[in-house]
Design a protein with these regions (language model features):
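Alpha-helical transmembrane segments and their immediate juxtamembrane cytosolic regions
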Residues: 2-14, 18-421
Length: 421
């Protein structure tokens, strides 16, 4: 099987397979959409696998640094789990709602997208409420106001009325609650993105790139309350989201020859090795003496808020190698050892919210009970087990509901956080 067979499926536009000699004169038809979609069939487990992996890595990164932190990708390159999460979300959202737009029209697809945006917004508000209660309870019970300052809720305690309004407007967020607001904004833009990609996918990606460049050139950003800006700038991160959508709607298939090229493979490997060396200089300063000063001046700071181009290209290199060496039919995807990751990835909205709650609980235990390496490992592994258990319960409940006559969803990539529902 070629890489072209691994990345996407069939074409839905045009009249492929009709020989010129057999063709009959027909009346002119409206121009077919320019996008392609994978055929509906078996679920794309690679998406679930890496989305689940991203959820686990985000949880570990939200904890105080510990031994397991060294197993997260942010210590070995420029990008981290956030890039994986946003790309897959864009991919799955485009697949689910791109098909809905082609089959049911713009208005129906937009209505479904807005319904999902509302669900994510409600989840964010609910998580915000629970998270504030958790932090406030710990800070009060242990008479340690540093928790409120460290987690960024001091303004809420001083002006709860104003802060709640700002939180509802997505302008005020405690620490570790920046992903869902970003996703809500990106999903609100999805109808326009899909409508544009329906006819001009490459032009849509080019316009997204121009907006990304304009963000850096003109310092575009979303302001936050009480000051500053969003931790993830939607004007910049939309590029990764749109790129994921572009790949889902035929872009990955059109790139199959590039992905199959040995040149692409070796360039990706070389870039990842170079990025790994740069990250080593953060922990072994002596190695920085071997880096050209001009390169350091050009490279730093590697901005996460505006999705630095080094982070974006690092993710592209990782994705290129993943597609090449992890085919869709890889037997390991059926392994029981990977099942916990896949199940978590299939219920990403619920598991992400749970991970934010567990991360602060772990932070509190490490600060108030014990902070040794053994406790760090215990907290990290316990949190992952709880996330897996919750995902299993949700899966079990949905199976029971399906057997009771609920509507069964048969899609390659359930959008979940990205869109489904």
């Amino acid at each position: 099987m070629t890489i072209a067979d691994q990345v996407t499926g069939s074409t839905i536009a045009g009249t492929a397979g009709v020989k010129p000699a057999d063709a009959k004169p027909v009346a002119a038809k409206p121009r077919a959409p320019a996008i392609t979609l994978p055929a509906i069939g078996e679920r794309e487990l690679r998406l679930d696998l890496f989305r689940g992996l991203a959820l686990w890595l985000i949880f570990i990164d939200h904890l105080p640094p510990n031994l397991l932190t060294w197993f997260t990708i942010r210590n070995y390159g420029f990008s981290d789990a956030t890039e994986i999460f946003i790309f897959i979300s864009g991919y799955t959202a485009a697949f689910v709602y791109g098909r809905a737009m082609l089959e049911n029209g713009f208005l129906i697809a937009t209505a479904r997208i807005l319904r999902r945006v509302w669900q994510i917004y409600v989840a964010h508000v609910f998580l915000f409420t629970i998270f504030l209660a958790e932090i406030s309870y710990v800070a009060t019970s242990f008479e340690n106001p540093l928790y409120t300052e460290e987690m960024g809720i001091m303004d809420f305690l001083k002006q709860p009325d104003v802060t709640i309004v700002q939180a509802l407007l997505l302008r005020f967020r405690p620490v570790n609650m920046d992903v869902l607001p970003l996703y809500i904004v990106l999903m609100l833009a999805l109808p326009l993105i899909l409508w544009s990609m329906k006819w001009r996918p490459d032009v849509t990606l080019a316009l997204s790139s121009l907006l990304y460049a304009a963000t850096w050139e003109f310092d575009l950003y979303f302001s936050a309350y009480p000051n500053g800006f969003w931790a993830f700038n939607p004007f910049a991160w939309q590029l990764l989201f749109v790129f994921g959508a572009w790949c889902a709607l035929g872009g990955a298939r059109r790139m199959s020859r590039i992905l199959a090229s040995p040149i692409t493979m070796w360039i990706s490997i070389a870039y990842l090795v170079a990025a790994f060396y740069v990250t080593l200089t953060w922990y072994v300063p002596q190695l920085s003496h071997f880096m050209p000063k001009r390169l350091e001046q050009w490279m730093y700071p590697i901005d996460k808020a505006d999705l630095d181009v080094l982070r974006f290209t690092h993710f592209l290199a990782l994705a290129a190698l993943t597609v090449r060496f992890l085919p869709r039919e890889w037997p390991g995807l059926r392994s029981p050892w990977l099942r916990p990751l896949i199940v978590c990835g299939q219920h990403s909205l619920e598991i992400f919210c749970l991970g934010v709650f567990l991360a602060f609980a772990g932070h509190f235990i490490l600060a108030e009970v014990a902070s040794g390496p053994a406790m760090h490992a215990l907290i990290s592994l316990s949190g992952i087990l709880i996330m897996w258990a919750m995902a299993w319960v949700i899966s079990w409940y949905k199976r029971v509901a399906d057997k009771s006559g609920a509507k069964t969803k048969n899609a390659v990539g359930n959008a979940d956080l990205a869109g489904g529902g």
